[in-house]
């Protein structure tokens, strides 16, 4: 599944896990992407959307 929101273009962020002894290893933070049926430009399509866009009403869900 794609890890980019098709509405706001939110994607993965990278950084470090930091242990108690301050050793650092790389890690990624992934957005909560849901594949939903939505009305896009008058037609129903399946789009990958983050949950923040769903909650804020930026996506019109198809019935």
UniProtKB/Swiss-Prot annotation:
Keywords, comma-separated and alphabetical: Ribonucleoprotein, Ribosomal protein
Gene3D superfamilies: Ribosomal protein L28/L24
Keyword flag Ribonucleoprotein: yes
Any Pfam family matching the protein: Ribosomal_L28
GO annotation terms (biological process): translation
InterPro entries in alphabetical order: Bacterial_rp_bL28, Ribosomal_bL28, Ribosomal_bL28/bL31-like_sf, Ribosomal_bL28_bact-type, Ribosomal_bL28_sf
GO cellular component, one term: ribosome
Superkingdom to which the source organism belongs: Bacteria
Single GO MF descriptor: structural constituent of ribosome
Keyword Ribosomal protein: yes
Cited HAMAP family: Ribosomal_bL28
NCBIfam families xrefs: L28
Family: Belongs to the bacterial ribosomal protein bL28 family.
Name used for this protein in its record: Large ribosomal subunit protein bL28
């Amino acid at each position: 599944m794609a890890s980019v929101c098709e509405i706001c273009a939110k994607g993965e962020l990278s950084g470090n896990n930091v242990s108690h002894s301050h050793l650092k290893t790389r890690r990624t933070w992934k957005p909560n992407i849901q594949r939903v049926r939505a009305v896009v430009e008058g037609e129903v399509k399946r789009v990958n959307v983050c949950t923040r866009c769903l909650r804020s009403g930026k996506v019109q869900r198809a019935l």
